């Protein structure tokens, strides 16, 4: 039995191939659809384990473009000698469940509180997120003692 391809099948196959090529060659998109999605994706890089199992949020330019606004991207991608990972407040981690709550929405800016246990120690950070044309990005992260911007500025190479 011989199956004959119709013009509609040719168009469908052509469309699928074009879409596959477009998605395969597209760089990582910047931003996320919601503040919660951005936070969940940050901490997904820390996994259920420790630095031996997970390297945390990568320091490459593509990841920086996806998670940070332009003013913070270069600092994130270029810092290499920090004494600890600011996003978990420790050089080692075993991150427990992450609690996310919106503190305040202000035009295109949203303040998000993030809390979790890291190896039995309670950690609370406040993310300042901005909404741009590509979605939500991090403009800063504040701990009770420091901010990500100031922290990265201290250790820039």
Q: Each PLM stretch: what is its role?
A:
Residues 125-130:
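Hydrophobic/aromatic beta-strand elements that line small-molecule binding cavities or substrate pockets
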């Amino acid at each position: 039995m011989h199956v004959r391809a119709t013009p509609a099948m040719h168009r469908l196959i052509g469309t699928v191939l074009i879409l596959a090529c477009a998605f395969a060659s597209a760089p990582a998109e910047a931003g996320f659809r919601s503040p919660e999605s951005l936070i969940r994706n940050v901490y997904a890089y820390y996994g259920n384990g420790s630095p031996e199992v997970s390297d945390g949020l990568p320091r490459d330019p593509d990841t920086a473009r996806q998670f940070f606004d332009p003013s913070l991207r270069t600092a994130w991608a270029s810092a290499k000698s920090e004494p600890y990972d600011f996003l978990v407040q420790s050089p080692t981690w075993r991150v427990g469940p992450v609690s996310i709550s919106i503190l305040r929405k202000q035009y295109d800016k949203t303040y998000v509180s993030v809390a979790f246990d890291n190896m039995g120690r309670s950690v609370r950070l406040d993310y300042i997120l901005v909404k741009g044309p590509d979605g939500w990005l991090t403009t800063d992260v504040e701990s009770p003692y420091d901010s990500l911007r100031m922290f990265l500025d201290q250790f820039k190479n």
